[in-house]
Every structure is written in C-alpha cells, then in structure tokens.
Amino acid sequence: MTNTRKTHPLIKIINHSFIDLPAPSNISTWWNFGSLLGLCLAIQILTGLFLAMHYTSDTTTAFSSVTHICRDVNYGWLIRYTHANGASMFFICLFLHVGRGVYYGSYTYFETWNIGVILLLAVMATAFMGYVLPWGQMSFWGATVITNLLSAIPYIGTTLVEWIWGGFSVDKATLTRFFAFHFILPFIIAALVMIHLLFLHETGSNNPSGLISNSDKIPFHPYYTIKDILGVLLLILILMILVLFSPDLLGDPDNYTPANPLSTPLHIKPEWYFLFAYAILRSIPNKLGGVLALVFSILILMLFPLLHLSKQRSMMFRPLSQCMFWILVTDLITLTWIGGQPVEYPYNIIGQLASILYFTIILLILPIISLIENKLLKW
C-alpha cells in the first residue's frame, strides 16, 4: 500500500514542500533563515492575536489598554514583549536572509526574489503600523512624520495624507484603521510566503557555490529539519533572553509617555530596523528627493538581477565582490547608527556620504567589479 503521506491530496503538498523535497547537499547555515522567518511570522501572528483580544484601538484607551495587558492579563507582559522583540528578531532574520540572497546570487531566481522584496515591504508596513498602536509619544509622532512624507507627492500629496489620516491630523480614525491593517497584513504576508515557496520549489534552492546541484540532492527530512531545529532553538533562546532580561533594550523610552500632540519629542526616530532607511531619507535636504531615496533604498533590491554582470552566480569565488559586499554591510550598519543620531555636524555629513556610498556600490561599483572579475578569469 502506498504511503498516505504521498497520496493524500493535502498531506502530499506538505510532503513535497518539507519532507521529500530534494535539497542541495551543501547548503550552509545561511539557508536556515527562511524557516526561521516562518517561525517568526507564526510567533507574531499568535502573540498578536492574544494582544488583540485585550487591546482597544481608541485614542483615549489605547495606551492604558497596553498598560492593562502588561499589569493585569495573565502573562500579558510576556505576550506583549515577545511580540515587540519578536519583530526585532523578524527583521534580523530578514536582513540576514536578504544578505545571503545578495551574496550567493539567489536573486537570479527572478520571481522568488521579487516576491521576497514585496514581502519585505509588506513586513515593513506592518511593523510601522504596529509601532503606532501603543499610542505613546514616539508612536504618535512617528506616525505623523512618516505619513506626512506622502505630502511630498506632487498635486495629490496633501489630499492623500488627509485621506490616510481620516482627518486633518493623526487621530482616532488613523489609529483604528492602522489597527485593522496591522491585523490583516500578516495573513496577506502568509499568503505571499506560500507564493514565495511555490516559485522557489519550481527551481529548487540555490547553494553556496552557485552551481547547478541537480546531480547531488538529499531529502529535506531528516537532514535539514534537524539543521533547522538548531536554528529554531537558538532563535527562541535569543528572543527569550531579550524578553526576560532586557525587554526594553531595543525600544524607545519616549513610548512610555502617552501621546501628546502638543509636545514634540526631542528626537523623533523609528524602531532600529528602519534607521538605515530613515538616515537615507534625512540625508537629502529636499522633501520629495528624500522620499524617493527612501523608497528606492528598498526597491533597489529588485534591480539586483539586472545588475548581475558576472559569469559566476555566487560571490564564493569572487574576492573583489566579497570585499565590496562587506563594505556595503558596514555602510548599512553606519546608516543605522546615523539614523538614531540628531541631524547635526558631523552626523549629517557622515549620513550623506554613507547614503551616496550605498547607492554607488549597488548601482556602479559591484557591476564594474563583476566585469573586472570576468576579465581576470581569462588570466
């Protein structure tokens, strides 16, 4: 009798995706982050669901409902901080996952890569709206500043901002709709993840060498399920250390002050995972220019398949490209640091230089180096 796992209409989909899936025999730990992102999404949806049971999306009670969750709900503090720090873990995994894709040339799987970029944008939108919900000072002013950027769009900008706000300022209507969007988006993300996997399984996974591995495949289970479990345990360990020992390490103290439209915080800044984009936005004096740079700093990822001029897929055997890649990583870390600093000398100059370097490396230096490496192959 044939195994149910291979014949049952529903179970066989799971079987072909996670059990009998042929996987390259040499994929490294950098390939763990896909499954870790799935785990992060599950954690966020579950903790978010329990938070939504106690949260009220009204400007008068939102802040106190979060306080109520932390003080009066059984393990409410644990759920709330797991959700807040879970978002940070989500973004750490996301950045590493994207970085791995850039380093090993995974972006040549065009559809998988582009859906991945759309996923990144959807997660960023969800995280931004989630940050507004506790209705602290940074929530309110963050929402005001970021939504206000849309007013830079010529002709329709102001109307668009007021339409998003549901009034003439960030108020009750804004909070209510942000809560609605924040609730629905993770499920849209989950659907996009399935499409992401569908396209990935059409081609199979890439591997560190960037070579075709059809002649050397192993089943996903037990080899990579065991390998993923190690990643899962480490992720949960780091998340729990964060939640139980320093839950506010990555947060902003200003958000423990209820939102007050009459008092502006000294430094308005988003959560740490948006700081690199925020630094790029601030480094351009013109409002529309800044907004375009901000959007393009993420959308530039979609250009990677077009800018790939190397004869080799992976950077594994391309030392010059490797050097540039790590300079790009340090540049992004620098931008993250600058995004959290006030706009004054020398930070503004460093931010402008780092922003120019970011776009120059991706659009100019990496493609040129790829061509040089192609020439070096003939030596």
From Swiss-Prot:
Does the record bear Transport in its keywords? yes
Q: What keywords appear on the UniProt entry?
A: Electron transport, Heme, Iron, Membrane, Metal-binding, Mitochondrion, Mitochondrion inner membrane, Respiratory chain, Transmembrane, Transmembrane helix, Transport, Ubiquinone
Per UniProt, what is the membrane topology? Answer: Multi-pass membrane protein
For this entry, the protein name equals Cytochrome b
Q: What else is known?
A: Heme 1 (or BL or b562) is low-potential and absorbs at about 562 nm, and heme 2 (or BH or b566) is high-potential and absorbs at about 566 nm.
Q: Where does heme b b562 bind?
A: 83, 182
Offer an example of a GO molecular function term for this protein: metal ion binding
- Tell me the SUPFAM superfamilies matching this sequence: a domain/subunit of cytochrome bc1 complex (Ubiquinol-cytochrome c reductase), Transmembrane di-heme cytochromes
Self-association or partners: how does it assemble? Answer: The cytochrome bc1 complex contains 11 subunits: 3 respiratory subunits (MT-CYB, CYC1 and UQCRFS1), 2 core proteins (UQCRC1 and UQCRC2) and 6 low-molecular weight proteins (UQCRH/QCR6, UQCRB/QCR7, UQCRQ/QCR8, UQCR10/QCR9, UQCR11/QCR10 and a cleavage product of UQCRFS1). This cytochrome bc1 complex then forms a dimer.
- Choose one Gene Ontology CC annotation of this protein and give it: mitochondrial inner membrane
Give me the gene this protein comes from. Answer: MT-CYB
In the record's cofactor note, how is the cofactor described as bound?
Binds 2 heme b groups non-covalently.
A GO biological process of this protein is: mitochondrial electron transport, ubiquinol to cytochrome c
**Principal subcellular localisation of the protein:** mitochondrion
Q: Where in the cell? A: Mitochondrion inner membrane
Q: What does this protein do?
A: Component of the ubiquinol-cytochrome c reductase complex (complex III or cytochrome b-c1 complex) that is part of the mitochondrial respiratory chain. The b-c1 complex mediates electron transfer from ubiquinol to cytochrome c. Contributes to the generation of a proton gradient across the mitochondrial membrane that is then used for ATP synthesis.
Q: Where are the transmembrane segments?
A: 33-53, 77-98, 113-133, 178-198, 226-246, 288-308, 320-340, 347-367
- Family named by the database record: Belongs to the cytochrome b family.
Binding-site list for heme b b566? 97, 196
Q: Which residues bind a ubiquinone?
A: 201
Q: Which cofactor does it need?
A: heme b
